[in-house]
Amino acid sequence: MNSIKFPVLDRTTKNSVISTTLNDLSNWTRLSSLWPLLYGTSCCFIEFASLIGSRFDFDRYGLVPRSSPRQADLILTAGTVTMKMAPSLVRLYEQMPEPKYVIAMGACTITGGMFSTDSYSTVRGVDKLIPVDVYLPGCPPKPEAVIDAITKLRKKIAREIYKDRIRPQQGNRCFTTNHKFFIVRSPHTGNYDQELLYPPSSTSEISTETFFKYKSPVSSHELVN
């Protein structure tokens, strides 16, 4: 596996002082302290669970799974994302502190997978809900591919500039036309507008009183005949 190149240190002064910038020091400290929030909804998450074992030992990368989004700086989505789960995913992402990163793992997360062909409730790409930093294709991806995706994310962190990363979130989030979603406001407050995600049904309900009022009586003789 390729090692991460971090050419930010000034090596002109030997054996005594290391000169660098605050931005480079911040990036270096975050390389080995990625705390992921595991968002698994389908079979792809089983492949990620195998990383916890001694064979792959993902602890060497400083990955410490967290159960709270407020303690995580990386969310790893694995599996199919449905319309019902979309508000929960957006809320979890908004509750994560900056800077935060997203890895989309598996075909179902990236494009909707095989469920997107005939399913009305499948979100065709998690990037329509939250910004994605690393795409990890596969059905499902191997654990080695997950390690490679984490390595690429660490390389991206090593090169980024802090002021560019702390940018305003997307003002609007556009959903696919097939889902009949609408453009919604930025959910920075954590209060997701449920009415925009679940529009009222076009069919109106008939009350019980109205149903029995206009229902014509049918005798047992007519029912038999």
UniProtKB/Swiss-Prot annotation:
The GO annotation for biological process reads: aerobic respiration; electron transport coupled proton transport; photosynthesis, light reaction
Q: How does it sit in the membrane?
A: Peripheral membrane protein
Q: What does this protein do?
A: NDH shuttles electrons from NAD(P)H:plastoquinone, via FMN and iron-sulfur (Fe-S) centers, to quinones in the photosynthetic chain and possibly in a chloroplast respiratory chain. The immediate electron acceptor for the enzyme in this species is believed to be plastoquinone. Couples the redox reaction to proton translocation, and thus conserves the redox energy in a proton gradient.
Q: What is this protein called?
A: NAD(P)H-quinone oxidoreductase subunit K, chloroplastic
**Family statement drawn from the similarity comment of this UniProt entry:** Belongs to the complex I 20 kDa subunit family.
- The source's superkingdom equals Eukaryota
Q: Which compartments does it reside in?
A: Plastid, Chloroplast thylakoid membrane
PROSITE patterns, from UniProt? COMPLEX1_20K (PS01150)
Summarize where [4Fe-4S] cluster binds, as residue positions: 43-44, 108, 139
How and how many cofactors are bound, per the record note? Binds 1 [4Fe-4S] cluster.
UniProt xrefs under InterPro entries = NADH_UbQ_OxRdtase-like_20kDa, NADH_UQ_OxRdtase_20Kd_su
Which reaction equations make up its catalytic activity?
a plastoquinone + NADH + (n+1) H(+)(in) = a plastoquinol + NAD(+) + n H(+)(out); a plastoquinone + NADPH + (n+1) H(+)(in) = a plastoquinol + NADP(+) + n H(+)(out)
* GO molecular function terms attached to this record: 4 iron, 4 sulfur cluster binding; iron ion binding; NADH dehydrogenase (ubiquinone) activity; quinone binding
Which EC class, in a word? translocase
Alphabetically sorted, this entry's keywords are:
4Fe-4S, Chloroplast, Iron, Iron-sulfur, Membrane, Metal-binding, NAD, NADP, Plastid, Plastoquinone, Quinone, Thylakoid, Translocase, Transport
This protein's encoding gene = ndhK
What the entry lists under Gene3D superfamilies is as follows: 3.40.50.12280
Q: Which organism is it from?
A: Capsella bursa-pastoris (Shepherd's purse)
Pfam families, sorted: Oxidored_q6
NCBIfam families noted in UniProt: nuoB_fam, PRK06411.1
